[in-house]
Regions:
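Carbohydrate transferase catalytic cores enriched for Leloir-type hexosyltransferases
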Residues: 1-238
């Protein structure tokens, strides 16, 4: 409350802060961050990743931390639905991120129990906390990124994937729509059947995961970064 300005990363967050404090709302301004797209030389070869993380098929990537609102359950329910309704074939989801949440310390055990109970170990591969370079590399080589969250201030994984021209499968929460990924498909937060059909469709359509010429992606990302820097400097200088 003593600051002259409060920087927020989304209009959705600004609407939320309005409910909490009118004083804070009046001092809040939008600064929608942009991620720098990695150079190709900084992306690990897929063969290295396959050996390191023990997989050998195309995959979707889910890099969310294991917090309840990140909504991993809907992804597992989608896989269970595919397995029992359509005979699960060649769909793999690789998931990384911290599994510690002091608010819900038993959450990761519930997730592991669900995976074991429903025989999903062959299609859901949790690899824990990994180096940032590997996060970007797995994102680069994936069929698509998945973010099923129930809530976000502004999703950094979505912005990372956007910077790389990736396909993104998203829950239809307001901030995800606000982020406007160029290549995106949405499903309702709890609609595992819709998510299942999206996964099956994308698994069949796109096995390499790269949507554009990477030089074009880098050029567009540089433009986006420059525009962000200019807007940020203007905002803090006024």
């Amino acid at each position: 409350l003593y600051s002259s300005k409060i920087l927020l990363s989304s209009s959705s967050a600004k609407k939320d802060i309005r409910k909490i404090s009118k004083t804070a709302y009046k001092k809040s301004f939008l600064s929608k961050f942009v991620f720098k797209c990695p150079e190709k030389k900084d992306i690990s070869n897929i063969a290295i990743l396959k050996k390191k993380y023990k997989f050998n098929t195309p995959y979707f990537y889910l890099p969310n931390q294991y917090w309840v609102h990140k909504n991993h359950e809907v992804v597992l329910k989608a896989l269970k639905y595919i397995k029992h309704k359509f005979s699960l074939k060649k769909i793999l989801i690789i998931s990384s991120g911290s599994n510690e949440d002091h608010r819900n310390p038993d959450y990761i055990q519930k997730i592991k129990h669900y995976i074991s109970k429903n025989n999903l170990k062959d299609c859901y591969h949790y690899i824990g906390v990994i180096p940032y370079k590997d996060v970007l590399s797995l994102m680069y080589h994936s069929i698509a990124l998945i973010n099923p969250s129930k809530f976000e201030g502004r999703s950094s994984t979505v912005e990372q994937a956007k910077s790389m021209g990736k396909k993104i499968i998203l829950s239809n929460i307001p901030v995800h729509k606000e982020q406007k990924p160029r290549y995106s498909k949405y499903f309702e937060v709890g609609n595992f059947k819709k998510l299942a059909h999206i996964l099956m469709s994308e698994n069949n359509v796109n096995q390499n995961g790269i949507n554009l010429n990477y030089n074009d992606i880098l050029r567009k990302n540089n433009e986006d970064l420059l525009n962000y820097y200019k807007s940020y400097i203007k905002l803090i200088s006024e």
